[in-house]
Amino acid sequence: MASGNNAQASGDNSNNIATGAGANAGGNNSGNLASGLTALANGDNSRNVATGRSSNASGNNSRNVATGFVARAYGDNSFNTATGTNANAYGNGSANIATGPNSNATGDNSFNIATGVNTNASGSGSNNVATGNAANAFGANSSNAAAGYLANASGANSANIANGTQSNASGTGSFNIAVGNGANASGNGVANTAVGNGANATGANSSAYGNGASATFGNSTAIGNGATATRANQQVYGTASNTYTMTGVTSAASTAAQSGPVQLVTTDAAGNLASTSLSALGFASPADIAGINSQLAGINARLNDLDGRTGKAVNGVAMAFAMSGSPWLMPSEKIAMSMNWGTFQNTNALSMSAALRVSEHVQASGGLTYGTNGGGLGGRVGMRVGW
């Protein structure tokens, strides 16, 4: 059925419909619909629908749909959909979807989706998705995703993800992720990650987390606002203005997790961390400390012995004082005895002495003393001769 000046509907065994001046719906065994000035819906064994001025939905064995001024959805064995002025969705064996003015979703055997003004999702054998004005996701055999104004996720055989205004995740055979306005994660055959506004990860398998963080060297990581990795295999945390807290370091579980000799963490003026042994810094090792403790034990034993001897010596002075009181014999006496007490520096001693007249000119004397503060028992004997 054709309705409109120069409208045409044609095809054997078909129910094609053309509505509008110059509209054309054609194809055998089909039910194509063209609605709008010079709209075109064409293809055998198809149910293509073109709605809008100069719209085009065509392809054999297809269900392509084009809606909008100059919208185009075409391809054999396809289910492509284009919605919006100058929207474009095409590819054989595909189900590409383009939604928005000047949006583009193309590629054979694909399921690419482009949503927004001037968006592009393209690539054969792909599942690329572009969402946001001027977003771009492309690459053959890929699953790239770009979300945000001017976001870009591109590369063949890749699964790159860009999320944020002017974010970029690109590279062949890659799994790069860029999240944040102006974030960039790029490189072929790598898995780089950039998270944060202006974050940049371009070194092989590098990661940058934080606004303005940068990891441009292989296997490097930068974490924190403005953190920058400056060499390969480096892990950078923050900047010189940051402080660091690791609460679990002091836990019993952390201590239990350690094995073997422990070491000290050291740093230089630039904050580069390393570890070293205690002996390397001039500190005593556990073996050294054990040796010192053994020596101290010996010294303490000697000091204890010396202290005991000193105590005896002090008490000995008190014993000497006590012994100094020897008895003397009167002319009529043959035996005399005396008892004395001596003290010195808070120590005490007791003594007992005796004198014996042996003959008219000879006297013998002797005594015993006992120090009560560790001095022990002492004694003396003596003889006096006079004429």
Model-derived features with residue positions:
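Small/polar residue-rich beta-strand/coil "junction" motifs that cap repeat-based extracellular fibers
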Residues: S3-A7, D12-A23, N28-L40, D44-S55, ...
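Beta-stranded membrane pore/translocator domains
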Residues: F283-W387
